[in-house]
Design a protein with these regions (language model features):
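Phosphate- and other anionic-substrate recognition elements at nucleic-acid/protein interfaces
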Residues: 1-167
Length: 167
């Protein structure tokens, strides 16, 4: 099973593709989509959408795992994150990829074993789990952590037992 993990952001969106065959997990690709504040926000959202469609059309993942939205103190940041997240979700729907959502707590527990783990702890554990020496940034390691979380849950079932959006 090929899983695309995504950590959406309005400036940097991380992604990671993991393949699980029996009990072996292989990292296929990872990286990030970077935007600059110099271009209008709607163009940044469009860039995220186009890049995600390109990644999904190239690799054809079966599932996409994405972090569920969380409460932020800065409402403007929350709105921008929501737009970036929507671009990723719409790309997945357009490409026919099943969507699964996980809370930050679920992701941290799946990777580190502790729900209040720091970005540094997640980054280090992802490198150990996947045997990758140089993951470029926290956005990418968070995306890979989200994919790891999904692979752990999908061994049993998703947290709700269903893909996101299906009742």
């Amino acid at each position: 099973m090929l899983v695309l993990g995504v950590d959406p952001g309005s400036r940097v969106t991380g992604y990671g593709l993991l393949e699980k065959d029996n009990n072996k997990v292989t990292c296929i690709d990872y990286g990030h989509i970077r935007s600059t504040a110099k271009i209008p926000f709607y163009e940044r959202v469009h860039k995220i959408f186009l890049a995600m469609v390109e990644i999904m059309n190239h690799y054809h993942p079966h599932d996409m795992a994405i972090e569920d939205i969380f409460y932020a103190k800065n409402i403007q940041s929350s709105f921008k994150l929501g737009h970036a997240r929507a671009a990723v979700l719409i790309a997945a729907v357009q490409c026919g990829v099943q969507i699964f959502e996980y809370t930050p707590l679920q992701i941290k527990k799946a990777v580190v074993g502790y729900g209040r783990a720091s970005k540094e702890q997640i980054h280090s554990m992802v490198q150990v789990i996947l045997n990758i020496k140089n993951i470029p940034d926290f956005d990418t390691s968070d995306a890979l952590a989200t994919a790891i979380c999904h692979l752990n849950w999908s061994t049993f079932e998703s947290p709700t037992g269903k893909p996101s959006g299906k009742k």
